[in-house]
């Protein structure tokens, strides 16, 4: 049973050294408030990867979930594109 709309993000896996956890870098393009120049801003999210299937460079979709640990509030929903080996 789904409760409301959950936030989702698409990003690239930058680290998978932790057990059942990956770090996903999500980039977004925003206009600078003063000058209007388009700049790229990035955020990193720790996400739960139950199957430990993600590799560095994979493009994944993460969705919001209940807090799993101090830093983890996201989980990997699907792998959109696998990294080239």
Curated annotation (Swiss-Prot):
Family: Belongs to the universal ribosomal protein uS17 family.
Record PROSITE patterns: RIBOSOMAL_S17 (PS00056)
GO cellular component: cytosolic small ribosomal subunit
InterPro entries on file: NA-bd_OB-fold, Ribosomal_uS17, Ribosomal_uS17_bact/chlr, Ribosomal_uS17_CS
Key word rRNA-binding present: yes
Keyword tags: Ribonucleoprotein, Ribosomal protein, RNA-binding, rRNA-binding
Protein name, UniProt field: Small ribosomal subunit protein uS17
CDD domains registered for this protein in UniProt: Ribosomal_uS17
Species lineage: Bacteria, Pseudomonadati, Myxococcota, Myxococcia, Myxococcales
Organism: Anaeromyxobacter dehalogenans (strain 2CP-C)
UniProt xrefs under Gene3D superfamilies: Nucleic acid-binding proteins (2.40.50.140)
Source superkingdom: Bacteria
Subunit structure: Part of the 30S ribosomal subunit.
GO molecular function: rRNA binding; structural constituent of ribosome
A Gene Ontology BP annotation from the UniProt entry: translation
Protein task: One of the primary rRNA binding proteins, it binds specifically to the 5'-end of 16S ribosomal RNA.
């Amino acid at each position: 049973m789904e409760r409301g709309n959950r936030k989702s993000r698409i990003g690239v896996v930058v680290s998978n050294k932790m057990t059942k956890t990956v770090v996903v870098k999500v980039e977004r393009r925003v206009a600078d408030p003063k000058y209007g120049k388009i700049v790229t801003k990035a955020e990193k999210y720790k996400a739960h990867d139950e199957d430990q299937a993600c590799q560095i460079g994979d493009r994944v979709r993460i969705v919001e979930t209940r807090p799993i640990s101090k830093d983890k509030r996201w989980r990997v929903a699907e792998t959109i594109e696998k990294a080239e080996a």
